[in-house]
């Protein structure tokens, strides 16, 4: 049976008043993915949504050690800098695999055509935390997921999507 893979994309700069909402929604999506038979989770390890996702999958691994995490890093020196930080070092240690897209930094290394294209191509489901902006990495990743006919689970954020109290 082929492994079912889920990846995440989302914004770094979430409004402070929505972080708890986003974390709760991400956890629900991860739990749904596990219930739907997903066993492998990919993250680009960018601050914000990507790292919240990793922390939550690590939490789920405590109950289900068969769950795998894969880090997808744009270039080697970025991986080295992540390993130098205590918090991200622990996250990387929890990963089943680390994929480094390029050995050396290049101006295009952060392009969606690298890391995020790789993640979408290798995933069955994409979880997107998205605020409706028409420019940026998140919307390009969402468009690519549509192009590739991947299952897309969207978590809306932004002023027009504030959760009711």
Task: State the predicted function of each range.
Residues 1-164:
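Acidic/glycine-enriched connector segments
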